[in-house]
Structures are given as structure tokens and as C-alpha cells.
Amino acid sequence: MSVLGACITPFKADLSIDFAALESVVRSQEHAGNGIILFGSTGEGLSLTYEEKLSILSFVSTLNLNVPIFVGVTATSVQETMSWIDFAQQWPIDGFLVPTPLYTRPGLNGQKAWFDRILSVSRKPIILYNNPIRTGVSLYPEVVKSFVSHPLCIGVKDSGGSAQACELFAESGLRVFCGDDNLWPDMRLSGASGVISVLANVWPELARDYVAQGRPIEAWKKVCSWLNLSTNPLGIKALMAAQKMIECDAVRPPLSIRDLQRRDELADILACRATLQTELLSVCRQ
């Protein structure tokens, strides 16, 4: 599978979880044949309580989805992380997306110990996650290489923003997922073989087709550049609300939708869909 949608968690105006919209979000990924990531930064995992995560897992498990479901794990305590994984893997999920711990900025040996402890408790596959902007530290390529032989370590998501870093991860032999929609063409050339996509939330089929053809497309770049002006998931929720895919573009504190940049360009960004479809068709015919 080349695309996993980094799914939003839709909220109602009162900031409670909108389960009807959530079903629509994950069903759209299933229809496109994309995998699903829950509770990542796009899904505002840090703003969800333990009980809310359980309610989402319970709800999604009743949908009998026919695509892989991975659960994002974000914490600073290794014991808390291990306990959460031990509990969450009782549900019918397919694995976990695990970054370096937040805030503490561990070095090479600390990162090895962190992932070693987590892998020791997991019975599901794990994708390691490099996201230095969010966590405060880069995932060391040496750490990735040290877990290559572990049967449950199946890949790396790289949101480091550099094709060079992607190449180092790819040298390990593990599968690398690009964590930035806009960088996919460059990271594909550097060894990435899939994308964990934010844009798949709003245009799941187009994301699938864009990743499959693997070449730069100007309309895609334009949308990604607009999204990157604001903290994720402000932009993607605004796009989805404008297309009536979700009830509203609400995000939970400390995020605020009032921080969305260039809202006046929203209609122009939505119009990129038709251009993107045309460009993808043109590329496929070449």
C-alpha cells in the first residue's frame, strides 16, 4: 500500500467528537484503497483524552474496514507509551506509528532504548517516525538500522523535510514513507516508497493517483504550499469544511482556527482540484 491517510479527528462546534463525520473520513480512505492513521498530529492526538481514544477505537472497529489501520502514539513517558500500546493492540488494528519522545530530545542511545522498550511490548508492527519539528529531535539513522532485523519494525515515516535524510533511512532497507505530501517526488527518488498523506483527507483518490505517478504537479504544490502556511491540521480542516465533508473546521486548544493563514484564498485552493485532475490525466497519458 502506497498511501495511508493521516486522518483528522472531526469535531462538532462544541468540540465533541463528530462520529458521523469520522466514519465518512475513514470510509473515504477505504474507498480509495488507502490505509488509515489515527491520533497523529493531523488527528490532534495530543488533544484527545484516553477515554476519547478508546471510544474512537471502539467505533472504528465496528466499521469492519478493509484497509490497514495504524494508531499514532505520542507521549514522553515510556511506561505510559507501553501501557497504551499494550491496551490498544487488543483492538483490530494493524500497527502503530511511534515517534521519538516529545520534548526530552534523547540522543542515539536514549532513542534505541525508547524503541527497544516499545517493541518489547508490542504484538503489532511498528513504523518509526522522524518528525524533529514536532518532537524536538531527529531520529538517528543508526537507530533505524539497529532495528532492521526486528520482525515488528516495518518502516519509517520521514517528516524531516529533507530528501537527504530520507536517503539515509532508505539505506537501512526498511520501507520509508514520505511524511510531507509536497516532497513526495523528491523523496521517491531518494528511496521512499509511499506517503502518509494529509491531503488524502480531502481528496483521497487524487492523493492515491498522485503518489502512483510520482512526478511533480504544479496544482499539488500550490495546495501543499497553502496548507504549510498554517499549523496542521488548520488548513486541511478548513478545506474539508468548505467542501461540506465535515460539519465545521473546529480544532481544539491550544490550536485555534483563527490562526489559519490566507483564508481568502480558500476558494482558489479548492479550485485546484479540477486542475489537479487534468494534470494527473495528462501525466498518465505521457
Curated annotation (Swiss-Prot):
Segment forming the signal sequence: none
One of the Pfam families matching this protein, by short name: DHDPS
Places the protein is found: Cytoplasm
Active site (record annotation): 129 (proton donor/acceptor), 157 (schiff-base intermediate with substrate)
GO molecular-function terms, A-Z: 4-hydroxy-tetrahydrodipicolinate synthase activity
Catalyzed reaction equations: L-aspartate 4-semialdehyde + pyruvate = (2S,4S)-4-hydroxy-2,3,4,5-tetrahydrodipicolinate + H2O + H(+)
SUPFAM superfamilies to which the protein is assigned, alphabetical: Aldolase (SSF51569)
Main location: cytoplasm
Domain of life: Bacteria
UniProt enzyme class: lyase
E.C. designation(s): 4.3.3.7
GO annotations of cellular component type: cytosol
Binding-site positions, pyruvate: 42, 196
GO aspect biological process, one term: diaminopimelate biosynthetic process
Keywords (A to Z) from UniProt: Amino-acid biosynthesis, Cytoplasm, Diaminopimelate biosynthesis, Lyase, Lysine biosynthesis, Schiff base
Site entry: Part of a proton relay during catalysis: 41, 103
Annotated metabolic or biological route of this protein: Amino-acid biosynthesis; L-lysine biosynthesis via DAP pathway; (S)-tetrahydrodipicolinate from L-aspartate: step 3/4
Protein family according to the UniProt entry: Belongs to the DapA family.
Oligomer status and interactors: Homotetramer; dimer of dimers.
Described purpose of this protein according to its UniProt entry: Catalyzes the condensation of (S)-aspartate-beta-semialdehyde [(S)-ASA] and pyruvate to 4-hydroxy-tetrahydrodipicolinate (HTPA).
Protein name listed in UniProt: 4-hydroxy-tetrahydrodipicolinate synthase
Organism listed in the record: Chlamydia trachomatis serovar D (strain ATCC VR-885 / DSM 19411 / UW-3/Cx)
